[in-house]
């Protein structure tokens, strides 16, 4: 309720489009200016060297996890998306985590106790943890091997995921560049399947 009231106080109906899009653009700019490029490169290297890649995001961050999982699935054969069906079920999946694995923990306000606990649990296994979050004061940061931050301050009651999505997009593109040959082969096979089974909805 406080978020709705605060958003309504900041902008009139006629200003919503300008306010939201401008605020989102500023978040991407601020994220770019503050990005730790060494941490970004380290995160990519950890992912490239992982035995398995586990991804978890909860609440609205689950969308980011799904996006990452979809494209990582084109880049790797060892990706495991943990869907937050319930607290105990999450830990059942995490029991399989090995020290040679990487766990990507995606969490933005409001943080959930479950993902904080899950991140702490994985860190104790010796696996590498990549935290994608809003600030270095996020509760998942103390349990991470490397942290990437993206701005997500809310201009309305809706969580702004534009900057986090852009950061993940950059990570996918960077990994794709490093795995250019494999990506080209995968996409080539995928296009052949589309053509063979007429799966493309748009023909140019």
Residues covered by each model-derived region:
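Exposed, interaction-prone assembly regions rather than primary DNA-binding/catalytic cores
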Residues: 33-51
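Glycine-rich phosphate-binding loops that contact phosphosugars or nucleotide phosphates
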Residues: 48-58, 62-166, 170-180
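Conserved small/polar residues in nucleotide/adenosyl-binding loops
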Residues: 202-204
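Short, flexible loop/turn segments with low-complexity composition
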Residues: 182-192
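Short, charged beta->alpha transition segments
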Residues: 15, 38-43, 89-92
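Short, small/acidic-rich helices and loops at N termini and domain boundaries
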Residues: 195-198
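HTH-adjacent hinge/linker in prokaryotic transcriptional regulators
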Residues: 1-38
């Amino acid at each position: 309720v406080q978020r709705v009231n605060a958003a309504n106080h900041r902008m009139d109906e006629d200003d919503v489009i300008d306010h939201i899009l401008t605020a989102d653009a500023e978040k991407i700019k601020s994220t770019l200016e503050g990005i730790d490029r060494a941490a970004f490169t380290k995160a990519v290297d950890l992912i490239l060297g992982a035995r398995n890649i586990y991804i978890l995001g909860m609440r609205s961050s689950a969308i980011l996890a799904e996006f990452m999982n979809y494209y990582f699935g084109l880049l790797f054969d060892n990706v495991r998306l943990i869907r937050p069906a319930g607290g105990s079920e999450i830990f059942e999946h995490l029991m399989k985590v090995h020290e040679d694995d990487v766990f990507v923990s995606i969490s933005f306000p409001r943080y959930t106790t479950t993902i904080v606990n899950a991140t702490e649990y994985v860190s104790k296994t010796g696996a590498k943890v990549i935290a994608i979050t809003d600030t270095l004061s996020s509760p998942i940061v103390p349990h991470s091997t490397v942290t990437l931050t993206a701005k997500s301050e809310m201009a309305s009651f809706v969580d702004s995921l534009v900057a986090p999505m852009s950061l993940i997009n950059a990570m996918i593109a960077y990994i794709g560049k490093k795995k250019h040959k494999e990506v080209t082969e995968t996409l080539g096979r995928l296009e052949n399947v589309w053509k063979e089974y007429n799966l493309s909805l748009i023909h140019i």
